[in-house]
UniProtKB/Swiss-Prot annotation:
Topological relation to the membrane, as annotated: Single-pass membrane protein
Keyword annotations from UniProtKB, A to Z: Heme, Iron, Membrane, Metal-binding, Monooxygenase, Oxidoreductase, Transmembrane, Transmembrane helix, Virulence
This protein's name: Cytochrome P450 monooxygenase AMT3
Gene3D superfamilies, per database record: Cytochrome P450
Disruption phenotype annotation: Produces smaller amounts of AM-toxin than the wild type but still causes lesions on apple leaves.
Keyword Cell cycle: no
Role summary: Cytochrome P450 monooxygenase; part of the gene clusters that mediate the biosynthesis of AM-toxins, host-selective toxins (HSTs) causing Alternaria blotch on apple, a worldwide distributed disease. AM-toxins are cyclic depsipeptides containing the 3 residues 2-hydroxy-isovaleric acid (2-HIV), dehydroalanine, L-alanine which are common for all 3 AM-toxins I to III. The fourth precursor is L-alpha-amino-methoxyphenyl-valeric acid (L-Amv) for AM-toxin I, L-alpha-amino-phenyl-valeric acid (L-Apv) for AM-toxin II, and L-alpha-amino-hydroxyphenyl-valeric acid (L-Ahv) for AM-toxin III.
One GO cellular component, as annotated: membrane
InterPro entries the UniProt entry points to: Cyt_P450, Cyt_P450_CS, Cyt_P450_E_grp-I, Cyt_P450_sf, Cytochrome_P450_monoxygenase
Binding site for heme: 436
CDD domains, per database record: CYP60B-like
Length: 489
């Protein structure tokens, strides 16, 4: 009886799946949108490229073939037009409806709570963001600048000086991980990891870096819960444990910070505690958000810095111009600070161009259209459609940028010959009321570190890092070692 049922069920499943594929291709409300037939038939097309780490390149290829909107799944549309940022991620208005976050993409943390980025209700998110917002304001950042400078000075005058004396190639990504995680640990919880002192990762950070490589697998298993049970081998038990350990380590640090006096500690948690509505977040909510900040507050900065250095090393004239701007603008290193760096036009142009070519988040985060549909870039998109801007593809599109694959910082300067570029297509920190809350902090950390490095040292490329930017994403970049050398100026 069991065998007979099994032989009967399998054809039914096959017939049902085949009928669904035919419907998706020929009858589905999205059938008129261009894209591969296989992508229209099944969501597994999208997940094949995602799990392979090459979805960003495949999306770029498809947009070159089909234009500014592509159907990348049965219920999934990818956009690259600049207007899509506002239409997809912007707030609701009287003339345009709001798209909500996709619950099939954003999972709760292992403690069952949702961090700010994964809150599905936009009003709830707005309430939580208001509590955290003062901690990430320019005023707070200026108050925290001495904390940042303490670690940056150690990086400049201890770690890099030793490496300059050794005159051997070293992995800049590893060194930046040590520096940025030390800074973020101090900024968030008044306790550095001490990794610059050791020039090595502590267990928590090793755990986190391993867990990040399996983020795409986790999202796949979330979306295909039943199928995921059959494919659980995609995420080894050790990777699951690493993710859980990251949350546990974060919780332990938060609990330790909670026991300290707010009056004696100046950090993000101190600003949070001072907010009149801080009590809306219980300890489990704080654990979840601290886990988020330890990733979002570090990964974007490390990615942007390493990408900027690589691109400058690949383009010596740009490096020479930036070095000249920095060294001509300051008479001493201590004059390099948050306020003075904002006025360096070529530095900011180089940073904008690096973020265009190597955005820290190469894929747009999905939203879902309301039940009665929405209008995106002039297209009437049916309800319950998953929509997003493919960041990397948008920034590499010839329809948005001239010399789209070339590092051209001058495109961000006046009268550069790139006035026809659709620069608003590049939104490395997203757009709208749910954009990156730590954008200002990231920009400052990037500026202060690259400016002080180039004020003190000459950077040299190592042959081992040729082709470094050809990376996979899961969905964040899987960064390889970036081997460089430094010399005292």
């Amino acid at each position: 009886m069991v065998a007979w049922n099994g032989t009967l069920v399998r054809p039914k499943l096959l017939i049902g799946a085949s009928c669904q594929c035919v419907y998706n291709i020929y009858l589905h409300p999205l059938r008129h949108y261009p894209g591969p037939k296989l992508a229209a038939a099944t969501g597994l097309y999208h997940w094949y490229w995602t799990l392979a780490g090459r979805i960003h390149r495949q999306l770029h290829k498809l947009h070159r073939q089909h234009g500014e909107v592509v159907r990348i799944g049965p219920d999934r549309l990818s956009f690259i037009a600049p207007e899509a940022w506002k239409d997809i991620y912007g707030p609701g208005t009287t003339s345009h409806k709001e798209n909500k976050k996709d619950g099939r993409f954003y999972a709760p943390t292992p403690n069952g709570r949702r961090a700010m980025i994964s809150l599905l209700d936009n009003q709830h998110h707005a309430s939580v963001r208001r509590v955290f917002q003062p901690a990430f304001s320019d005023r707070s950042l200026r108050a925290l600048e001495p904390v940042i400078n303490k670690h940056v000075k150690r990086l400049m005058h201890t770690n890099l000086r030793q490496l300059a004396r050794a005159d051997e190639p070293f992995d800049l990504v590893h060194l930046l991980n040590c520096a940025i995680f030390d800074i973020m640990g101090d900024l968030m919880l008044s306790e550095s990891f001490g990794m610059l002192e050791q020039s090595a990762y502590v267990e928590w950070i090793e755990t986190l870096l391993v867990a990040l490589r399996y983020e795409s697998v986790g999202q796949f298993l979330l979306e295909y819960a039943t199928l995921g049970k059959l494919l659980s081998f995609l995420m080894p038990p050790s990777a699951r444990r690493k993710r859980e350990q990251h949350v546990q380590y974060t919780a332990q640090r938060v609990d330790k910070r909670q026991q300290k006096s707010e009056a004696t500690k100046r950090d993000i948690w101190g600003f949070l505690a001072a907010h009149e509505n801080a009590e809306m977040l219980d300890i489990e909510d704080k654990h979840a958000n601290a886990s988020l900040f330890m990733v979002a507050g570090t990964e974007t900065t490390i990615t942007a810095l390493s990408g900027l250095v690589f691109l400058l090393l690949q383009h010596p004239p740009c490096m020479r111009r930036l070095v000249a701007e920095i060294r001509d603008s300051f008479t001493c290193e201590d004059a390099i600070n948050m306020d003075t760096l904002q006025g360096l036009s070529y530095l900011n142009a180089c940073l904008s161009e690096a973020l265009r070519l190597y955005p820290p988040v190469p894929l747009g985060n999905p939203r879902v259209t309301p039940a009665d549909g929405n209008v995106i870039c002039g297209h009437a998109v049916p309800g319950h459609t998953r929509v997003y801007v493919s960041t990397w593809a948008a920034c590499r599109s010839a329809s948005n940028f001239g010399d789209a694959d070339s590092f051209m910082p001058e495109r961000w300067l006046p009268d550069s010959g790139y006035d026809s570029d659709r620069k608003e297509a590049s939104k490395p920190f997203s757009y709208g009321p749910r954009n990156c809350i730590g954008k200002s902090m990231a920009y400052h950390n990037i500026r202060i570190i690259i400016a002080r490095i180039l004020w003190n040292y000459d950077l040299l490329a190592a042959a081992e890092s040729d082709g470094w930017m050809k990376q996979e994403c899961f969905p964040l970049w899987d960064k390889k070692p970036l081997m460089v050398r430094v010399m005292l100026r």
